[in-house]
């Protein structure tokens, strides 16, 4: 728990969020993939519609090995090349992995400290705003059409307020320092728009 508390303090991401990502991505490190990354990414870089993308991931994997942070036998992951406790792609690893345990290596496979801090760093660098909610439940007016709405079809919070949305408890959407200009989309409980 000390590692999580420190990572949360350094990067401003709640412990619960870091743990949620860890649980979703690898069942807390139990399932991180079985495919050798060099072979998987080498194959994907030579066939299919995303060859260029996977070629970049393949060469990033080679650089990880060259740097010595991980050994080839440690680099096993998903068929698409994500690896470690929180399933980083090799280019994301290069950009955002952290040596949080101070051993001189960024090891997202064997070091839970490095993996969880790197996850918090990833979220922070990708726009996590400390103290702001990632989302909240809302009540949609019965007469409001939500056809075509999704988490990708974002509108300002003020726009959602103008359309009659309130939080599930009946309180206003805009509160606690949230800006009315903040962009937000709708998600259902199963991850699809209503």
Describe the residue ranges of each PLM region:
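Catalytic glycan-binding domains that act on GlcNAc-containing polysaccharides
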Residues: 1-181
